[in-house]
Amino acid sequence: SNLREYNRIYKEVNDIYRDAASKFGLSNSVFDILYTICEVGEGCLQKDVCDATFIPKQTVNSAIRKLEQEGYLTLSNRKGHSKHILLTESGHTLLKETIFPIVEAENEAFTELSFEECNLLLKLHNKHFTLNNNVSKSFYENSIIRTFYL
């Protein structure tokens, strides 16, 4: 089925990142956090990491504390109680050795697609996400209603 094929491809893509994390000696959550810092920018908040990765807040907090203890980053209060993530020199080196090569490979893969193919890929992924999101919300809302009224 199309769904089975989509799920197989999705899993294989995820496996590429999990294998990379493992080869670099990083947990999946640390890899995702570093990737997010690379993508969103230094000085981002823990909330930004949670929003970008869908990793639970407690897991992000634990992984960031570990990275802080290992000397890869510091947390800085700039506004209120929000903690901004700042990389140390070791953190910048870690990013250059682990995340940058992955981003480079991703960019290289995208350059193999035409402009139209890139746009179509993004358009279809967004459409698929929106449809899944709508169906999930509807299912969730109907499940709650059934629970209360049955």
For every predicted segment, state its role:
Residues 15-59:
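N-terminal helix-turn-helix DNA-binding core of bacterial DNA-binding proteins
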